[in-house]
C-alpha cells in the first residue's frame, strides 16, 4: 500500500514547493523507493494548455499527451520517472468532473456541494495516482499559498485524507519563508508561526517544516520555530538559497528531510546512493569554457516560458564540460534591429516553440543568419516551421511562403494544418499531443546523434510540413532526417552541408535529464564548442 506526502506552502507564493517535492522524490528514489508526484493547481482552467505563457510559464507535455504545469517537468527531471495526465489536477478539472457526474445522475438527486463532493473527487484523484503508478510513496504538491481562498478545497481534501489511510501512512510538509530584516539583523519567525496557525485552523498539523532563508538558521531559531509550531526541532529543516536547483536535494539530505519523512511514514531509512547526483552538482559548479547560446523567442520577458529548453541546454553543457552563457533575444527586436546586431558573437542559436504571428519574421531572420553564418542552429516545433519558411523564401524563391496558421490565404502554405485537425473547433487539449514514434533516416546527422532507428518524442502542434513542397525541399540540399513510420509526417530536418543545422516538429526538451541530455541538444553544444578558441579538432563522440 502506498504512503502519501503532502507539500503545502505559506507566507509567500513561489516559495519552492515544487523543488522541495521533486527533491524529496529524488531522495526517496536514492533509497530504493518508487515515487510518483502530482500537482494540485487551484485555478479554474481545466489545464494550462490555453493559458498565456506570461501568466503561467511553460506548458509541460506528458507522454500520454496531457498539457500540465511546469512543475511536472521538475518532477520528471529530478526523479527520472515519467508522469501522466493523472499527475496534474486543477480546480477546473475537478469541477468539470463533478458537474458531469451530476448531469449523468450519478449523485441520485442529492445536493452537490464542495464538501463532500468536490473534496471527495480530489481525494479520488490522489488515490488514482497511487493505484495506477504502484508507487511506494505518492507526493502531492498543493499549489497556491495557505490562506488563499482558492486552495481551501484542496487543503480540506488532504485533511480528510487522514480518514482514508492510517496515521503512519501520510505526512504533511509545510514550506515557509524566514525573512531577514536588515535593520534588526534578524531572521523573523512570526510569518511562519502565523502560516502554521492558519494551517492548524483548517485541521492540518505539519509534521515537517522546510524553512527557506538566504542565511544560516541556528539551533536556537530552530527550537523556537519548533516550539511555537508544534514540530520537533529536528523536523525544522533549513533550506538556504542554492546556486542551482540541482543542489537542493543534497542540501535537504544533509538537513535530514528524508529521514524525518520516513520516520513519520514508518518506513525504513535505507542507505542513500546520491553519488551520481553529487557528481553532477560538482560538475555544474566547476564548468568548462562557456558557449554563447542565443534563445530567440516570443516570450523571453518570462524565462519560465522556456524552462525545459533552458534546462536541456544546461544538461547538454554539463555532459560536454561546458558552461552555458545564455542570451535571451526577443524575436521582435530582430525585426527592428536586424539579426546580426543581436546575434553577432553567438556560438549557437535556438528557436523554440510558440504560437501566433508576432515575432515570426524575427525568428525567420535569425534562422537565415545562422544558416548563412554557419552558426549551429536548433529549431523546436514552431522553430522547425520557421526554418521551412526561411528555406522557401530565401532559397526556393517562394517569397510569400508562410504557414497557413499565420496567413490562411497564402499562395504558398509550406506549413499547413494536419488533416485530422480540419474539423477541430475547441482549443483546449485538441492538438497532436504526447509521444509519437519517429523513424530516423540512416546515415543522417540525426542517426549519428540518436543511434536508434526509431525514437519516441513528445509533440504539441496542429500544423505540419506541407508535403506538396517535399521534392522541392529535398532538391535544395536539405534532408528529411526523421519522419512518422508511414513517412507521411516530416518530424526532423537538417542541412548536411552546415556544421549543425537541424530542426524538429516535436519537443525534445521534455525528455532531457541532468544525467542524460537529449541527443539533439548535446549535438548542438558539441558543434558550438568547435567555435571556441583551442577547441578540439574533432567533435567528441556522443555517449
Swiss-Prot record:
InterPro entries: Class_I_gatase-like, CTP_synthase, CTP_synthase_N, GATASE, GATase1_CTP_Synthase, P-loop_NTPase. ATP binds at residues 14-19, 71. One of its GO terms (biological process) is pyrimidine nucleobase biosynthetic process. Allosterically activated by GTP, when glutamine is the substrate; GTP has no effect on the reaction when ammonia is the substrate. The allosteric effector GTP functions by stabilizing the protein conformation that binds the tetrahedral intermediate(s) formed during glutamine hydrolysis. Inhibited by the product CTP, via allosteric rather than competitive inhibition. Keywords: ATP-binding, Glutamine amidotransferase, Ligase, Magnesium, Metal-binding, Nucleotide-binding, Pyrimidine biosynthesis. UTP binds at residues 13, 188-193, 224. Pathway: Pyrimidine metabolism; CTP biosynthesis via de novo pathway; CTP from UDP: step 2/2. Signal peptide: none annotated. It comes from the Bacteria. Its EC number is 6.3.4.2. Residues 1-267 are annotated as: Amidoligase domain. GO terms for molecular function: ATP binding; CTP synthase activity; glutaminase activity; identical protein binding; metal ion binding. Mg(2+) binds at residues 71, 141. The active site is at residues 381, 507, 509. L-glutamine binds at residues 54, 354, 382-385, 405, 462. CDD domains: CTPS_N, GATase1_CTP_Synthase. Residues 292-534 form the Glutamine amidotransferase type-1 domain. CTP binds at residues 13, 148-150, 188-193, 224. Homotetramer. Catalyzes the ATP-dependent amination of UTP to CTP with either L-glutamine or ammonia as the source of nitrogen. Regulates intracellular CTP levels through interactions with the four ribonucleotide triphosphates. CTPSs have evolved a hybrid strategy for distinguishing between UTP and CTP. The overlapping regions of the product feedback inhibitory and substrate sites recognize a common feature in both compounds, the triphosphate moiety. To differentiate isosteric substrate and product pyrimidine rings, an additional pocket far from the expected kinase/ligase catalytic site, specifically recognizes the cytosine and ribose portions of the product inhibitor. PANTHER family: CTP SYNTHASE, CTP SYNTHASE-RELATED. Belongs to the CTP synthase family. This is CTP synthase. The lineage of its organism: Bacteria, Bacillati, Cyanobacteriota, Cyanophyceae, Synechococcales.
Amino acid at each position: 500500500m502506498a504512503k502519501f506526502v503532502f507539500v503545502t506552502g505559506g507566507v509567500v507564493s513561489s516559495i519552492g514547493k515544487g523543488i522541495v517535492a521533486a527533491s524529496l522524490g529524488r531522495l526517496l528514489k536514492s533509497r530504493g523507493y518508487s515515487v510518483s508526484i502530482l500537482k494540485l493547481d487551484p485555478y479554474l482552467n481545466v489545464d494550462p494548455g490555453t493559458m498565456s505563457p506570461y501568466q503561467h510559464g511553460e506548458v509541460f507535455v506528458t507522454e500520454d499527451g496531457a498539457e500540465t504545469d511546469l512543475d511536472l517537468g521538475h518532477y520528471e527531471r529530478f526523479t527520472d520517472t515519467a508522469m501522466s495526465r493523472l499527475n496534474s489536477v486543477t480546480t477546473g478539472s475537478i469541477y468539470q468532473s463533478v458537474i458531469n457526474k451530476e448531469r449523468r445522475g450519478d449523485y441520485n438527486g442529492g445536493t452537490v456541494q464542495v464538501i463532500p463532493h468536490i473534496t471527495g473527487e480530489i481525494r479520488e484523484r490522489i488515490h488514482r495516482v497511487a493505484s495506477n503508478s504502484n508507487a511506494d510513496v505518492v507526493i502531492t504538491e498543493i499549489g497556491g499559498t495557505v490562506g488563499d481562498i482558492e486552495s481551501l478545497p484542496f487543503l480540506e481534501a488532504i485533511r480528510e485524507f487522514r480518514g482514508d489511510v492510517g496515521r503512519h501512512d501520510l505526512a504533511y510538509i509545510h514550506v515557509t519563508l524566514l525573512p531577514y530584516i536588515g535593520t534588526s539583523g534578524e531572521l523573523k519567525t512570526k510569518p511562519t508561526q502565523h502560516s502554521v496557525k492558519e494551517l492548524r485552523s483548517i485541521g492540518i498539523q505539519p509534521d515537517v517544516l522546510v524553512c527557506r532563508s538566504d542565511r544560516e538558521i541556528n539551533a536556537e531559531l530552530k527550537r523556537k520555530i519548533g516550539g511555537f509550531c508544534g514540530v520537533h526541532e529536528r523536523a525544522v529543516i533549513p533550506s538556504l538559497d542554492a546556486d542551482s536547483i540541482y543542489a537542493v536535494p543534497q542540501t535537504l539530505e544533509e538537513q535530514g528531510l528524508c529521514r524525518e519523512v520516513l520516520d513519520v511514514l514508518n518506513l525504513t531509512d535505507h542507505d542513500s546512493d546520491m553519488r551520481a547526483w553529487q557528481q553532477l552538482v560538482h560538475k555544474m559548479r566547476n564548468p568548462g569554457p562557456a558557449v554563447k547560446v542565443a534563445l530567440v523567442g516570443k516570450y523571453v520577458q518570462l524565462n519560465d516560458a522556456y524552462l525545459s529548453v533552458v534546462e536541456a541546454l544546461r544538461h547538454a553543457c554539463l555532459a560536454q564540460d561546458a558552461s552555458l552563457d545564455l542570451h535571451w533575444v526577443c524575436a521582435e527586436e530582430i525585426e527592428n534591429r536586424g539579426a546580426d546586431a543581436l546575434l553577432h558573437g553567438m556560438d549557437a542559436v535556438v528557436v523554440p516553440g510558440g504560437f501566433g504571428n508576432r515575432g515570426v519574421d524575427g525568428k525567420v531572420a535569425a534562422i537565415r543568419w545562422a544558416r548563412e553564418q554557419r552558426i549551429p542552429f536548433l529549431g523546436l516545433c514552431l522553430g522547425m516551421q520557421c526554418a521551412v519558411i526561411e528555406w522557401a523564401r530565401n532559397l526556393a524563391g517562394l517569397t510569400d511562403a508562410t504557414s497557413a496558421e499565420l496567413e490562411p490565404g497564402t499562395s504558398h502554405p509550406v506549413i499547413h494544418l494536419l488533416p485530422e485537425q480540419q474539423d477541430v473547433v475547441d482549443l483546449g487539449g485538441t492538438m497532436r499531443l504526447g509521444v509519437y514514434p519517429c523513424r530516423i533516416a540512416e546515415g543522417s546527422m540525426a542517426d549519428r546523434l540518436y543511434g536508434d532507428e526509431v525514437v519516441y518524442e513528445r509533440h504539441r502542434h496542429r500544423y505540419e510540413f506541407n508535403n506538396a513542397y517535399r521534392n522541392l525541399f529535398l532538391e535544395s540540399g536539405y534532408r528529411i532526417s526523421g519522419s512518422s513510420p508511414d513517412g507521411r509526417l516530416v518530424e526532423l530536418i537538417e542541412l548536411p552541408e552546415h556544421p549543425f543545422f537541424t530542426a524538429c516538429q516535436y519537443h525534445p526538451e521534455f525528455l532531457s535529464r541532468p544525467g542524460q541530455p537529449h541527443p539533439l541538444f548535446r549535438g548542438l553544444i558539441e558543434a558550438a564548442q568547435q567555435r571556441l578558441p583551442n577547441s578540439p579538432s574533432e567533435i567528441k563522440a556522443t555517449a
